[in-house]
Design a protein with these regions (language model features):
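Glycine-rich Rossmann-fold phosphate-binding loop(s) that bind the pyrophosphate
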Residues: 19-20, 48, 117
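N-terminal FAD cofactor-binding segment of flavoenzymes
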Residues: 40, 44, 48-95
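Active-site-proximal substrate-binding core of FAD-dependent oxidoreductases
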Residues: 329-335, 351-401, 516-518, 548
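Iron-sulfur cluster-binding cysteine motifs and their immediate structural context
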Residues: 489-520, 527-549
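A short alpha-helix-loop-beta-strand transition element characteristic
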Residues: 71-87, 138, 204-212, 368
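N-terminal Rossmann-like FAD-binding beta1-loop-alpha1 element of flavoenzymes
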Residues: 14-44
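Predominantly flavin-linked oxidoreductase catalytic cores and closely associated redox partners
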Residues: 127-288, 348, 352
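FAD-binding beta-loop-beta segment adjacent to the flavin cofactor pocket
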Residues: 302-333, 460-470, 482-498, 505
Length: 553
């Protein structure tokens, strides 16, 4: 159908895919550089969510170092970072007890702020628009466009009003081609176009395999007596076993609200493990449940995290564009922070891209994209590189298990201060770590009580999902039968457990199992694209404005 459609086009100096912290920081920095150099440049940001911040999900405890550089007067301009961290606690949990651990430098949040990433992103969008950046929410970047020489020309937004059969409906609107001298991919973790770019330009050929986590988060309203504004708690241990990397957080922010979340490394081995159920179980711990008893859950969401760090970063630039933020993988996993690193990567990219921008009024056009090759050098000379270098050995050490990994981390961070004369390797791709079901023990999860613990469907309701049912599937199976022949028969259908939204379901049809995909439940976490054992599932963007609206998450 695409071949027969005529799409309109628009020309910009820079097109940015994704209105998250990195995309908006890049847009703001580019406009600042243009003003400083007395130039006018056009910058366009496309965002698949219904508004800037709709798909933004993080803890979030924010280190303001990058924001201080980008917008020094952010306090005067009303940035929604108002709840400073007042106390840090680190716990190791057993089934019944909690042990206080020393607060290591990675968990020292003095000077940081507990905030809603969605609110911060909306504020950044306002700052960008005030500088003349054009932001188009509700438009999913569906295709990368290329010049004849293979360099990136821009992107095309997805068609709207296409039916489930792939044919135009009465409300059909073709996508728009957005051409640019430079295209910045800021899609976040496991971005669908970023994934294509990395593969096409072989940007990861000198990198170690990327590794990921799944983060699941709820927001609760609790009583004033239980609310401790500014308190930040991180925990390790129970309910996960000693072979599985993960942990939890509890953040007390404003208005009697508490954010609680759980992260599981997607290199886990047991196909019977359910990150969602482990999260619900975590809340039943005596030390944790006392905060939430009598409270009310008001929001829910989930998102994959990119955990590989420095040694898993791909090459950052290619002809016609760059990767920024979590699309590349700048998360500092030991600190459980990626917002300030995403913003800094974007600022460095903007500084590398800006000198390449020609005045299009003085040239007839362009038929090739230039490469911002010094983006890599700028990164390596920045505090961002130093921070990721110091953190590089923590995540891969957990391939030895939680106890040895924790011991190594203590030595690496407290004695070597992240400057050990070696760099550890990751142990392979996450989907390859899953063991066959026959070699693993099923895990018995209790039924939720609907008060402290919940099921997936009631949780997804709180993610404020929007999804047009009559549209093509955005969860594409290379071979549908593989979901039965391999996933069901050999791995006991792990997607029915790792998906935090109940998208994947085994149903009986004529006495035989069939995979049913409930695409309308999808919260865009991308876990299936990462963890499927044969990489049979590909996540692509659904129609623009689909998915969650996280609001104050």
């Amino acid at each position: 159908m695409t071949e027969s459609i005529t799409r309109d086009s628009m020309q910009y100096d820079v097109v940015i895919v994704g209105a998250g912290p990195s995309g908006l920081s890049a847009a703001i920095k580019l406009k600042q550089l243009a003003e400083k150099n007395g130039r006018e440049i056009s910058v366009c940001v496309v965002e698949k969510g219904s508004e800037a911040g709709a798909h933004s999900l993080a803890g979030a405890v924010i280190d303001p170092i990058a924001l201080n550089e980008l917008i020094p007067d952010w306090k005067e301009k009303g940035a929604p970072l108002t709840r400073a961290v007042t106390q840090d606690k680190v716990l190791f949990l057993t089934e019944k007890k909690a042990f206080n651990l020393p607060v290591t430098p990675n968990f020292d949040n003095h000077g940081n702020y507990i905030a809603s990433l969605g609110e911060v992103v909306r504020w950044l969008a306002e700052q960008a628009e005030n500088m003349g950046v054009e932001i188009y929410p509700g438009f999913a970047a569906a295709e990368v466009l290329y010049h004849e020489d293979g360099s990136v020309k821009g992107i095309a937004t997805g068609n709207m009003g296409v039916g489930k059969d792939g044919e135009p409906t009465d409300s059909f609107q073709p996508g728009m081609e957005l051409w640019a001298q430079q295209t910045l991919f800021a899609e976040g973790c496991r971005g669908s176009l970023s994934k294509q770019i990395i593969e096409r330009f072989q940007l990861d050929q000198n990198s170690q395999p990327q590794t990921y986590g799944l983060g699941i988060k709820e927001i609760w309203e609790v009583s004033s007596e239980k609310h401790q504004p500014g308190l930040v708690i991180h925990s390790a241990g129970w309910p996960l076993d000693s072979k599985t990397y993960g942990g939890a957080f509890v953040y007390h922010f404003d208005d009697n609200k508490v954010a609680v979340g759980f992260v599981v490394g997607l290199d886990y081995q047991n196909p019977y493990l359910s990150p969602f159920e482990e999260f619900q179980r975590f809340k039943t711990h005596p030390e944790i449940r006392k905060t939430f008893e009598g409270g009310r859950r008001i929001a829910y969401g989930a998102r994959s995290l990119i955990e590989g760090g420095l040694q898993s970063l791909p090459k950052l630039s290619f002809k016609g564009g760059v990767l920024i933020g979590d699309a590349a993988g700048f998360l500092n996993m030991p600190r459980i922070k990626g917002i300030h690193t995403a913003m800094k990567s974007a600022m460095l990219a903007a500084e590398a891209v800006f000198p390449l921008l020609e005045n299009l009024e003085e040239v007839e056009g362009f038929d090739s994209g230039k490469e911002a090759a010094d983006y890599q050098q700028r990164f390596e000379q920045s505090w961002l590189y130093q921070e990721l270098y110091a953190a590089r050995n923590v995540r891969p050490s957990f391939k030895w298990g939680v106890y040895l990994g924790s011991l190594y981390t203590g030595i690496d961070q407290m004695i070597f201060r992240g400057k050990a004369p070696w760099t550890l390797k990751h142990h392979g791709k996450d989907n390859e770590q899953l063991k066959k079901a026959a070699a693993c023990k099923p895990i018995d999860y209790r039924k939720p009580d609907g008060v402290l613990t919940f099921d997936r469907l009631s949780s997804v309701f709180l993610a404020n999902l929007a999804h047009e049912e009559n549209q093509p599937d955005h969860l594409v199976l290379k071979n549908p039968q593989t979901m039965i022949d391999v996933n069901y028969k050999e791995y006991a259908s792990p997607e029915t457990r790792y998906c935090p939204a109940g998208v994947y379901e085994i149903v009986e049809e004529n006495g035989s199992p069939r995979m049913q995909i409930n695409a309308a439940n999808c919260v865009h976490c991308k876990t299936c694209d990462i963890k499927d054992p044969t990489q049979n599932i590909t996540w692509i963007c659904p129609e623009g404005a689909s998915g969650p609206n996280y609001g104050g998450m």
